[in-house]
Amino acid sequence: MSRKQLALFEPTLVVQALKEAVKKLNPQAQWRNPVMFIVWIGSLLTTCISIAMASGAMPGNALFSAAISGWLWITVLFANFAEALAEGRSKAQANSLKGVKKTAFARKLREPKYGAAADKVPADQLRKGDIVLVEAGDIIPCDGEVIEGGASVDESAITGESAPVIRESGGDFASVTGGTRILSDWLVIECSVNPGETFLDRMIAMVEGAQRRKTPNEIALTILLIALTIVFLLATATLWPFSAWGGNAVSVTVLVALLVCLIPTTIGGLLSAIGVAGMSRMLGANVIATSGRAVEAAGDVDVLLLDKTGTITLGNRQASEFIPAQGVDEKTLADAAQLASLADETPEGRSIVILAKQRFNLRERDVQSLHATFVPFTAQSRMSGINIDNRMIRKGSVDAIRRHVEANGGHFPTDVDQKVDQVARQGATPLVVVEGSRVLGVIALKDIVKGGIKERFAQLRKMGIKTVMITGDNRLTAAAIAAEAGVDDFLAEATPEAKLALIRQYQAEGRLVAMTGDGTNDAPALAQADVAVAMNSGTQAAKEAGNMVDLDSNPTKLIEVVHIGKQMLMTRGSLTTFSIANDVAKYFAIIPAAFAATYPQLNALNIMCLHSPDSAILSAVIFNALIIVFLIPLALKGVSYKPLTASAMLRRNLWIYGLGGLLVPFIGIKVIDLLLTVCGLV
């Protein structure tokens, strides 16, 4: 659920944007946009000419020249207004985040445990590694990891989602964000950042976008626009000697008007606004992008790597069955599985403990009282377990346990292989339990594929995007779930190294890869991916490696991220097509008007039957300014997007924005010409 959306033309934002538009008239600000800088120079030049004409220092129609000059300044102001309005919307979103930051005190613990003595210190003095206690009603003072306890947390100030979430030590839900509120119970938190480096601080800095850099495609388009501007500038400059040689030299004011109408001012004036609005729309989806480059890359993505758990399935795998090996009692298997899971804080581990209680009334035992050593799960070993007395119990993936058994001189039973295959073919995940070198049996973990996910993958396939499911399950389980979900491919028994290798393989083929992640083990792959969406509930390492953060911690959001990225690219392309098509119509308005006196044959091009040369030129300049304002909503909201193939989208946009770009100026210029004539202004 997103926070409240701003109205497109919020009155306070419009007023502020108008002020900023005037401030941006300074040369330093204009220089950043070469196309509009040419318009700015033309405005300055025609203003000087108008003043000279009015004072009698130059011959000519001072009123006409002043009208042209005024509308050129308005053109620059409208372009500035579009950019300022987009920036203002982003800053307003940043200000809403700043409201989350509150001056508060924290209870800094002297020892890293609940009940230890605490000192009351200002929250902004907490450093990385400090341990704090937060209880019901408290604001979490820093970003960190829960090391003890569990609590219900209200994260609506950050995510906009009203439903509270559970944060607890261990597992995937241990990360907390400063500025959120504890609703119940208590947490002991280890701060993971220093002051000024919190997630909220980085969010605000990213959203404000003060250092927004142009993306590669934006730079390429700017170079194209500069090239077109130079071509039209040279062409316009050569027209004066031609007209002078014909005996009726065209005025500098008319030449400036011609140049401004021919260069791509529409897209030139809206280009920055489109980029800023793309990042703003991403925030509207509760995704923070670190740069416009990340948003743009999302639009070019053609491979999606999707974690099975939480993205394709509901992500709440639960132990559903104990399947003992031949010669092993089911209760013996359940007892060993529970012992191996006593210190396992993952949902799967806890479900194993609960299932053993339910089936055989095996009460949970304390690891410390048993004088046992817990062996945590790692991405490399893909096992966890416990060492107690002379017993060494492990649970983990089939391959990991097989290697463990063989390394200890044992043999992996064929009947267990059959049981593993049976569980996997049912779409469940098999975990194998072993004591020493003796395999005790299999635990079945069951998950459910999300409703409607198959249809979404079909849409992505239609857009030319390949979907790849990433899972730690064995190949049989992965194949069953992949077939049910409708993904194009899958990577089974995935390790961090395998994910990284797969991304590099696709990139070597010239593809752009997007993925999501939330764990420290995802960080290398997130850093390598072109679009890397880290979950807000994930670890600090994952957030730092990604170039986007999903505040809702919803892995399925990756599909929406791609949608927004493609919409931004389509908006830029559509308005570029519209802008260039505009020039053709303006050519038919100004060229006959400017040169008909010198070359009467050009009257044949006056297909719009405009009233007079002056009205034709002024109408084209007015239209050139007004079209920027009319297109601001489209630049900010983005063009309508549908999941189509690239060729189908190109045809659609050429018809709508190419043909529209030709017809709209003909109609608009003719209407303005009629109004000027009826009102006696020309």
UniProtKB/Swiss-Prot annotation:
Q: Which UniProt keywords apply?
A: ATP-binding, Cell inner membrane, Cell membrane, Ion transport, Magnesium, Membrane, Metal-binding, Nucleotide-binding, Phosphoprotein, Potassium, Potassium transport, Translocase, Transmembrane, Transmembrane helix, Transport
Q: Which SUPFAM superfamilies match?
A: Calcium ATPase, transduction domain A, Calcium ATPase, transmembrane domain M, HAD-like, Metal cation-transporting ATPase, ATP-binding domain N
Provide the reaction this enzyme catalyses: K(+)(out) + ATP + H2O = K(+)(in) + ADP + phosphate + H(+)
What would you give as a GO molecular function for this chain, any one?
ATP hydrolysis activity
The places in or outside the cell where this protein is found are: Cell inner membrane
Q: How is it modified after translation?
A: Phosphorylated at Ser-162, which leads to the inhibition of the ATPase activity.
**Entry-annotated residues carrying Phosphoserine:** S162
Q: Which residues lie on this side of the membrane: Cytoplasmic?
A: 1-33, 81-222, 264-574, 632-653
| Consequence the record notes for mutating D300 to E/N | Does not affect formation of the phosphorylated intermediate
* Gene3D superfamilies from the UniProt entry: Calcium-transporting ATPase, cytoplasmic domain N, Calcium-transporting ATPase, cytoplasmic transduction domain A, HAD superfamily/HAD-like
- Binding residues for ATP, per the UniProt record? D344, E348, F377, T378, A379, Q380, S381, R382, M383, S384, K395
Q: What is its EC number?
A: 7.2.2.6
Topology with respect to the bilayer: Multi-pass membrane protein
For this protein, the parts annotated as crossing the membrane are 34-55, 62-80, 223-242, 252-263, 575-595, 613-631, 654-678
Q: What does this protein do?
A: Part of the high-affinity ATP-driven potassium transport (or Kdp) system, which catalyzes the hydrolysis of ATP coupled with the electrogenic transport of potassium into the cytoplasm. This subunit is responsible for energy coupling to the transport system and for the release of the potassium ions to the cytoplasm.
Q: What is known of its domains?
A: A protein-embedded tunnel connects the potassium ion in KdpA to a water molecule at the canonical cation site in the transmembrane domain of KdpB. The structures suggest a translocation pathway for potassium via two inter-subunit half-channels along KdpA and KdpB, integrating KdpB directly in the transport process. The periplasmic potassium ion probably enters the selectivity filter of KdpA, travels through the water-filled tunnel to reach KdpB, and is released to the cytoplasm by KdpB. KdpB undergoes conformational changes, whereas KdpA, KdpC and KdpF remain static.
Q: What is this protein called?
A: Potassium-transporting ATPase ATP-binding subunit
Instruction: Look up and give the organism this protein is from.
Output: Escherichia coli (strain K12)
Gene name tied to this protein = kdpB
